[in-house]
Structures are given as structure tokens and as C-alpha cells.
Amino acid sequence: MGKIALAMTTTHGPQLHTTAEQWALRLPADHKNMHPYRDGVYNFNDLVELRKGENLAERSTMSAMKQARERCEQAMTTMADKWAEVNPDIAIIFGNDQHEIYGDDLNPPFMVYYGAKIPHYPASEETRKSAPPGIAEAEAGHAAPEYREYDGIPDLGEHIISTLVEHDFDVTASKSWPRGSKNGASHAFGHIYRQVMRDKVVPNIPIYQNTFFPPNQPSAKRAYEFGKCVKKAIDSWQTDKKIAVFGSGGMTHFTIDEEFDRAFIDALKRRDKQWLTSIPLKTLQAGTSELKSWISMAGFLENEET
């Protein structure tokens, strides 16, 4: 079996790929949309009233946002530098899709990609025009600047799939992207390729989970057990390669709940399986749902020394 040389979790939101000055481009959508927050669903004005004692206005000044953007950039640089220092041979990436390659016609709860090549497309002009303000501007942070192909790991992918099936996961297997898809790897994976690997992409296995869209979102408990089972496959795969594992997505958004984020990170640190797997599905909605990729990675690392 290979050595788990590195484990990382990261958000991949558009704020990481845009300037602080561009963050306000999301305001019209924020005003229009309904937002899950602490098991309820609210409009923008109701959230302002509900959270008026938190001094959020002070944290939304341009000066404060620039400082926050700088901290984010420093954190991403630290991650990329650590990646380069460890220099893993291959990677396992837990992520999700947001109607980039899957849609309402087919949206698997779990999918393992086992193709020989992983297509990574630049954002098309159609995609840029149809994307909401603040999203189109972020495309360069995760979409390839030109068409690229990265190496998959077909034998490992097949082994993961067969192990999952053996342990009662009815997982979707994908040897190529759905017909007609011109997006290739979803932004959860493109963020890792571009921002952490800095475009020097090692052979990897993209593992998809439908965190986002009802009605077939896996529970936190199922996400944890899924990651744990993927680790069983890695442990029984014969290799001497250094392996990295990623959880891509989160944290709470679009309504930020820093108290929950900190509690979640604390649970990860103390390996509190009970806390992580007990988070109700109604809490893990919208962008916050992507934390299930982190929960899968926690299951993956359950018996791993760190």
C-alpha cells in the first residue's frame, strides 16, 4: 500500500479567484436569493435583522475585505508551497459538481472517475456570458487557460469502484465525462489543479459527491463512511507511491456562519466522528453542503496517524 503523505482541505469559492473590489458583484444575487442559515431559510433583509448584533458592516468595509483577501491568498500560498515541498506522486480528490458536467437529467450521489485522461477545458464564451456576475470573473482561478489533459489512474479507479461495491456502495463509475460536456473537470477539482498544484498536475482520481442538489444528497454519516471505504481501497492497492488526499469545498456559504465553521474545524482536529456524522442534512445545504467532502476525507483518515 502507498503512503498517505499529505492531506488538505480547502474552500474553492469565487472570492479566492477575484479581487476584494469584485466581491460586491455578488450583491444582486445575494439580495434576490433565499439563503439557508442555521436550519432556517431567509431572505437578505431578514438575515440583516437577524444578525444585526454581529457588527458585520465593519467586516464588510473595503479595507476589511482587502485584509481578508490577503489572508486567503497567504493561506493558499502556504498550501501550494507545502504541496511542492511534499511532492506527492498521485492524488485522491473529494469534490462536487454544480451542474458543470451533471444536471437534472442525471446527478449521481457518488461517482468515481477512472478514465485514463482527465479533460480540463477553459471557460467557453457561452459559459462566461451565462454565469452570474462575480462567478464569470472567477473562472480563471479554476478553469484551464487552454484545453489540457491530465493523467488519471485507471487501475486505482477501478479498484476503488470494486471496493465500494463490495462494501455496499452503489457507486457510479465514469470512464469519460457525460456526452456533450465541454467543461471537463468541475471547479472543485480545477481549483486544486490550478491553485494548489500550480498547473503541475499529478495523476489523480476525481471522486464526486452530490453535496448540493436535492433530492439525492448523501447524509454526513454516509459521506464519512464513503471516505472510510475509499481508504480501504487505497490500503489494499499495491504501490510505493506517495499519496495526497484533498477535500475541496465549503466552508459555510452563501451565508457565512463563522461559529459553525470553527466548531466544524475543532471536530476535525479532535477526530470527533459523532459530531461530524450527526450534522443534519438541513444544515448541509447550498455551499455549506460541500463540507461533506471534508467529512469524507475525515473518514478516509480515521485510522491514519497525523
What function would you assign to each model-found segment?
Residues 1-88, 108-228, 233-236, 256-306:
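Flexible, D/E/H-enriched segments
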Residues 12-14, 95-98:
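Short glycine-rich, polar/acidic loop-and-turn segments at beta strand-coil junctions
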Residues 89-95, 207, 241-249:
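Beta-strand elements within well-structured catalytic alpha/beta cores of enzymes
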Residues 97-99, 251-252:
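Catalytic metal-binding/acid-base residues of hydrolase active sites
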Residues 103:
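Active-site pocket-lining segments that scaffold enzyme catalytic pockets across diverse folds
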Residues 241-243, 254, 285:
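Basic polyanion-binding and macromolecular-assembly surfaces
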Residues 248, 254-255:
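A structural signal for small-residue-enriched, beta-sheet-centric alpha/beta enzyme cores
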